[in-house]
Every structure is written in C-alpha cells, then in structure tokens.
Amino acid sequence: MAKSRYEYVKSFEKDDSLLPNTWMVLRIDGRGFHKFSDKHKFEKPNDKAALDLMNKCAQSIMNEFHDIILAYGQIIVSQFSSNYVYYWKDYLPSKELLYPPSFDGRIVIYPSDNNLRDYLSWRQGTVSSDKNELLFSKFNINYNKLPEMFRKGSLLIHQKIEEKTINQKGLEVTRGKNVVPILHVDIIKDEFWEIHLELGIKI
C-alpha cells in the first residue's frame, strides 16, 4: 500500500552492514543436535557418514557462493539446511530422516589475518590431551590413532586444477577447473598457509 498511512512501518526495516576489508566468518551450528544425533542413532564418538554429509553441504555452499574462499564443517544457512535434507539418503541410506534438522548462523568479523588464523587455530586446537582422556575413558579409543578427519576436522578451499580433456577436434587440451576439495590438515602451523598463498592470508 504505497503512499498510505501504513507506509511508516517500512522505517522499522534495517539492513545490518558489515565492515569492509575484514575477514567475515560465518559459523553454522546445528540446533538441538545432541537430540537429533541420538534420535537418528549416529555412531559415537564420531559418525563418519554424518560428518561426510556435513562436508557435502559445505562443499555445495562453496560451489554456489564463489566469494567464500575457505570453510571450516542467512541464505547460506537456509541452503545448508536444504542440502542436508537433500543429500541425506546419499550418505545415510539405512536411516530414515525422522524430522528436518535446524541450523543457525552468525557472522563474526576478524580485522586481521592473524586474528583469522588465531580463530581457526582455536577451533582446531582444542586440547588434544583432554579429548584423548575422554575418548579413552568413555569409548576405549586412543585419540592419536583416529583418522585425521576426526582429529583435524574438515577444511574446504577453492582450488584451480589443470584437467586434460579431448576437444571437439579430437585433440587433447588442458583446461583449468575449479574444485572444492575436502582436506583434513593442520591449519595451526605455517605449512598449510605457505602452500596455499592463493588464499591471500599473510603468514
């Protein structure tokens, strides 16, 4: 109802602006996921298929939004939730999805490369000795013998690779292709950042 006495309500609509020239981290969390994982009988302490499903969702997001250069796993949260339901049967074919999952997202701004690296180090570097003790006492599992996926977490980045293919003339040509690999690596030390200078994060 344009130009009506009710139009004043539009003044309540505010766009939140984020600071430019900063690292914006969108953290997506499952809401009520302890109950969700119990109801769906996820393996404890780690369910590889369920984690692979999460990684696939993050990978799909990065394929859709090319501005995201790195993912460590409001339209994005919505798409993540949709992907989770869509790919459920691909990763957990023997389990019926009893109810849709719920995710929330928050954006945190980090003003420097060091701040971003410290955040990622904190996410990956929760005290391994505490994890070791917990896993051993509850599940008789040695933390140090777990696959990298469970110890390091999953990291996704945009990468350009060269791929050989045959063109319409039957000749072999090399073309660049964008991919989003799922990595399970140490991001606390400098080595990863030295290898991936294309991410633009100073060491």
Report the location of each language-model feature:
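Regulatory and interdomain segments flanking nucleotide-handling catalytic cores
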Residues: 1-203
